[in-house]
Each structure stands twice: as C-alpha cells, then as structure tokens.
Design a protein with these regions (language model features):
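Conserved alpha/beta-domain cores
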Residues: 34-348
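Conformationally flexible catalytic loops at phosphate/diphosphate-handling active centers
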Residues: 1-9
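Acidic/Gly/His-enriched mid-domain segments of enzyme catalytic cores or analogous surface patches
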Residues: 8-45
Length: 348
C-alpha cells in the first residue's frame, strides 16, 4: 500500500496521507520555493549590498562540506565560522598537531584572499567526541566550549599552535572562542595564544602574523560585558542559536519545549539591539553567525538593528543576497523599531 508523505522542514512535521486540498497547497509552496530559488541564483554573484549601495558582508559557516564550500568561494566574503570540532568528531582519537595544521591550511589557502575565522574546539552538550564521553544531568549548562579547553590547556595549545602554523603563509586567520562566560576566560585564552605564538616562532625561526581574536557572544552574561571586552578582543560574533536558548531557558533539542524556542521573541530582539548599540559605542567589530543570519524573516530586522556582517550556511547565501539588494534601510530601521516595541512574537 503506497502512502503519500509530506516532510515540512519549516515546521518540523511529517504528514502522512494529507487531505488533497492540503497536498495541493504544499505543491503550490514547492513551486513558489523553486521559483524563488531561480530568482535568487540570478543575483548570487552580484555584490551583497542594500538598495542604498551600502555593503553587507555575507560570510559562510563552514566545516561540513569542503567541496561545496569551495564552490561558494566567489559568492561570499569569507569564512565567518569554521567549526573545527567536525574533524575531531569524525576520528577515533584527538587529531595530532600535524593533522590539524593540514586541515586548517587547506581552509586558509582555499580562501587565501579572504578572512577565515576558525572557532576553537566547541564540544559538549549536543556535540560529543566518541573518545571523550561527557555525561552530565544538564549538559547545556555544563562542561562545554572554552570551559573544556581551558581545563585541559594542552588541547587548546596544540590546536592554537596548529592554527598559527597554518596561518604563517597566508595571514588571513581570525580565532573565535566559544561559550565564553567571563572576562577571566578571555584573559586566560589570550595568555595561552601568546604562549602558542612564541612556541611556533621558536619552532620555525621567524615572526608570524598574529590573528585577530574574537568571542562568541552566546551567553547572556556577556551581553552586559561589552565595555570590558573592548580592550581585550577585536570582534564579537553573536551566536543567536545558544543566546536564544539561554535567554528563554529553552533546550531546543528537547521536544517537549522546542516549540518555545523563538529567535523573534521580543527579549531576544532587545538583547540583539543592546549588543549592536554597545558594539558601536565601544568600537567592537560586530558579527552574527546563528541561524537568524540565514533566515529571510530575520535579516531585514537585523539590518535595521545595525548588523552588517552575517555568517550563514551555504544554502542560505543566494536568498539572503537576493533579499539584501531589495532592502530599503529606512524601512528596515522602522521595522526593527516596531519589533522592539512588540510585547509578543506574533506582533513582530
């Protein structure tokens, strides 16, 4: 007996033998999606800019598919987030320093005329290493990200040395620290990065370029610490996935509460507005790399709030560039103002 299935990726639903009228509606939506994709592809090689001509940097979240990422090279402004944990997760043990050098060199050289941001090892919670199992009652609030690598500094030093060695010839590296919750962690990471730099220079016998340093802003505590961050780092990258999760106290991987996870919640938008305001005030380079960056529903609001550096998955690049070229800055600012006045997501 044949069944008709509809997979709705937007709603996270699987429909079995839907009513004919509902099936017809989904077929219409598929046709619209295909038409929009064709329109977007026509713009994908044009510069990412607003109607006013102001440029917006469209960057790539990378680490999953090198072949696909290389094909996008001419369409993007660089790598906004390279997930270094992916190679760690695919092996049966920690990759050696030499293996990591080769991995990072490949990415830095593939985009040698563009900035490449490598995030240090970000495991724990939903990203586990098979050879370093972590069992916790509340992993989202547990041992993860920079907490792990600062507790085991040898892992951090090996990785940073590999990054610095890989960058010696190209000089296009930025380093991004994940899950930062305090100034102490940044200071300790900076000390270790300086130490790694000295060790690499002793090893190769000449001075190497120092990378730009940034932090993932994904823990609410750091939203209020931008004045203290300004003298310590070069940029912040807002990780909207975890920031939303922590602001709303919702585990997005828990099916009982996942429907409450909402990037357009007024509290999330107000936090993003505060971050953009303080970043400009204190002269911090502002970036955003969560799912919101690739969501056309969110992009206009982000532009209105002042975000001009968006990093997204490859499938979103064409549509976001298509949308950006049609955004009127005054309309975007008005939309963001109205959104900040909203009391509920439905009003946004």
């Amino acid at each position: 007996h044949r069944r008709t299935l509809v997979v709705d990726g937007y709603r996270g639903e699987l429909l079995v033998d839907p009513e004919p009228v509902l099936l017809q509606e989904y077929q219409r939506l598929i046709s619209e999606e295909n038409e929009l994709s064709k329109l977007a592809e026509d713009d994908v090689n044009l510069p990412a800019q607003l109607k006013s001509g102001e440029r917006v940097k469209v960057m790539l979240n990378a680490g999953l598919s090198p072949e696909h990422e290389e094909k996008l090279g001419s369409r993007i402004d660089g790598i906004g987030l390279y997930r270094t944990e992916i190679p760690f997760m695919l092996q049966s043990g920690f990759p050696s320093e030499e293996e990591q050098v080769a991995q990072y060199q490949g990415m830095l050289q593939m985009f040698n005329d563009k900035p490449v941001t490598l995030r240090t090892l970000d495991v724990g919670a939903d990203k586990q290493l098979p050879y370093m199992p972590i069992s916790e009652e509340n992993p989202c609030l547990g041992w993860r990200g920079i907490r792990i690598t600062l507790d085991q500094p040898e892992i951090f030093l090996i990785q940073v040395r590999a990054m610095l060695r890989a960058n010696a010839a190209t000089g296009n590296l930025s380093i991004l620290l994940p899950m930062v919750t305090s100034i102490d962690e940044i200071d300790e990471a900076r000390r270790l990065i300086e130490r790694a730099g000295r060790e690499v220079e002793e090893m190769i016998g000449y001075a190497i370029p120092r990378p730009r340093l940034g932090v993932m802003l994904e823990v609410p505590s750091m939203v209020f610490m931008l004045p203290q961050l300004a003298s310590r780092i070069d940029f912040i990258s807002v990780g909207t996935n975890d920031l939303t999760q922590y602001l709303l106290a919702v585990d997005r991987n828990n099916t009982r509460v996942a429907s409450m996870y909402d990037s357009l919640h007024p509290a999330v938008l107000r936090a993003l507005a505060m971050i953009a305001h303080d970043a400009e005030r204190f002269g911090i380079d502002l970036r955003l790399c969560g799912e919101m960056a690739g969501d056309p529903m969110c992009v206009t609001i982000l532009i209105g709030l002042g975000y001009r550096h968006l990093s997204m998955n490859g499938r979103s690049v064409a549509r976001v560039k298509y949308l950006l070229r049609r955004i009127d800055i005054e309309e975007a600012q008005e939309l963001s103002r109205r959104s900040l006045d909203a009391q509920m997501t439905a009003e946004v």
